[in-house]
Each structure stands twice: as structure tokens, then as C-alpha cells.
Amino acid sequence: MGFSLGAMMGLVRSYRRAQNEVSLCLARRERIQETAFSLDSFSSEDCLSLFRFLPHHIVKLVSLLHLVVPFPRSRLAVDPVECFCVVLRRLASPCRWYDMEELFGRHAPALCVIFYATLEVLMHRWDPLLSEWRVDFLRERAALYSTRIEEAGAYLDKCVGFIDGTTIFVSRPGRGFQRACYSGHKRRHAIKFQCVITPDGLIAHLFGPWEGRRHDMTLYHESGLDAVLSDALVIQGVQHYIYGDAAYLVRPWLQASFRGVMTPNEEACNETMKVPRSAVEWGFKDVKQVCASLDFPRKLKIREGPVGLFYRAGALIWNLRCCAYGSATADFFKCPPPSWEVYLGSLLGLGGQGAAAGSTSKEESGPSGAGGAGEDGDEAGGA
């Protein structure tokens, strides 16, 4: 039986295609096998660009976070420092798993397992730093916060932080979530978070994710923060408060911008609070700048990944980075953030002693402000 010329050419093309795929697989295997991850192989500048922290700070953070990641369903043996670096790199840039193979010397499936296992361990232990209002820690720093905000030109003298909602754009979800996630204000599909940011640049409280169509006041009610602040912000018999925009309803512990027809004094109050209140917007920008993958909607897909957990992890990483290198918010208010030991100890009940006096200035070896490692020139990788 003879073969036609077209059939013969098809067989030749299939053979060459298979040969090319084998060559690519062999080259990929050799490229990965030649790489062994070590922080010592990175300069300080490269480490800041890739992982957002200096090498010795990463090692110290892994120790302070007590990061031990088990892999019971696989035979992976991964150092905790490498696990943490996988999380940092994945959040720092919207890169693909394939792009990270040469950096870590591991195949994409292994990197995916390491990332999600480390993220689960990290957030299970340390997410309460964001979800709980640490009363003792924040009470001891309340005097410092209110003083720094007043010195920045604010009209209100007992304000200890600023509250606002932020919208994280996501890829268009499938059926069942499109209406819930669609924000008529932004005209995009999104999820929402509520943040309370203090003048040292830290995210003191983070609630979410929530449907993108919800109002800021709805998030405030659902967060349960109202009941907590009613007692927590009465400090030594003096009522303190946080400040938000006109979307919030006024309470003794929550002040908001005046709206409607205003007197000259009310207009002056709004004007003096306008710039300090923008500190909360700087915090939203800082999180997305340090964790650039959170600003790439094509990779944030509902039902295909824990999108809300990614943002919460980014907020925690930002807080840790702020403690070491400071932020634009801390520079504006001249309010140094606490050290890592004090910040992490506040969750363990150890941050009470010297929380206000234990504030540290920015590390001499670190960058200044939020933008020090925010721009690494990464190109947005494909999904």
C-alpha cells in the first residue's frame, strides 16, 4: 500500500514537532538541574527587587515567623527560607510558574505546591495580625498616633487612624458571581476590603474579601469593628476615634467628613483632614506596589485561586516590610513603625512592654519609603 505525498509530509512534520518538544524538555531539565537556590547568590539590590527584602532580613523574618512548612502528600524537602522566597517572588510580580523555574531550580508543579503550602501555614498563624484589633498594642501607641496626626495639621486631636474601603479588580468571573462582583461605581468586576491604617504606615485591621458591589458602610457593619471600637478606643477615660470619608456614619469612635451644607468651621475641618486622611490611600498603593501581582486582574480569577487570601498575604508582607524600611505614611507623620519583635509579639501577648517606646527607625541598610523596592521593571507575565 503506497502513501500519498501529503501523508508523507504530515508524518515528517509530526516527527520534527516531537523532536523539538523532546529537545525543549531536555534543555529545560538541564537548566533546572544546574540551579540550586541560595540567597547568598543574590546581591542586595537583586534581592530587594525580586523578594522585597534584604537577604539577612529574609533569614531573620523566617526565624521570627517560626515558619515550618510540612509537605505530607509529597516527597519535597524544602528549606523554610526558600519556601518564604517562593511566596515573596510569586506575589511581588505577576510572573508565571515557568518564569520562576530557573530562579529556584524546581519544576512548576513543585513551585505551585510550595507556594500554596507556605501561604496556608503563614496566614493560619499570622492572619490575626490583620483580622483582630490588638487592644493592648494599639492602646499603648494611641498617644503617639494622635499626637503625630495632630502635628501633621489635622483639626481633630484624638484621631488614631484612618478607615476606608479598597477595590481589587479581578478577572471576569463565571456564572453566579458576575452580578455579586460587579461594581457599578467602578464599572468593573472586583472584590472589596476594608482597611484601618495607622500613622506609622501599618494596616492595623483588614476585613474582607467581600463582594465588589457592597458599600463601605456595609463592610463596616459586617466586620464587627463597631462593637470592638466602642470599648477599645476609650483610653484612660478619654474617647479616641478613627476617621473616614463621608460614606461612614458618625459615632463617638468613628468620625467622618462633614457633608451637605456646611458652616465655615466644618469646611475648615474637612480641609485640614483631607491630606492626613489620604494616608489610607497611600497604604492601598503601597500594598499593590510591593506585591504587584495584586494589580494584575488577569491573574486574579475567582474560583481558580484564593484571591482574597493573596491580598491578605500581601498586606501582611507590606506590614513586615514597613517595620523594617518605613513608608511614605510614616515619613509624612514622622511616626516610626515598631520593630518586628514588637509587631509580631503584639499577637502573642508580648508586645505590651515598650510597644510605644520600642519603635525603631528605618534600617540603615534598607531603602527609604515605600518605593524603595516597588519598581523592579517586571513585565506582566501571561496567565
Which sequence ranges carry the predicted segments?
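Charged, often Cys/His-bearing segments associated with DNA-binding zinc-finger transcription factors
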Residues: 1-72, 124-127, 326-327, 331-336, ...
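Short alpha-helical segments in extracytoplasmic peptidoglycan/chitin-binding modules
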Residues: 54, 86, 100
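Short, flexible loop/turn motifs enriched in small residues
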Residues: 55, 80-81, 187-191
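Amphipathic, well-ordered alpha-helical segments in soluble domains
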Residues: 57-64, 89, 96, 114, ...
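Structural recognition of short helix-loop-helix hairpins that underlie histone-fold modules
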Residues: 59-77, 94-95, 291-295
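Alpha-helix N-cap/helix-initiation sites
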Residues: 75-80, 108, 112
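Short, amphipathic alpha-helical "recognition" segments used to contact nucleic acids or chromatin
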Residues: 80-93
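Short, well-ordered secondary-structure "scaffold" segments embedded in the functional core
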Residues: 96-383
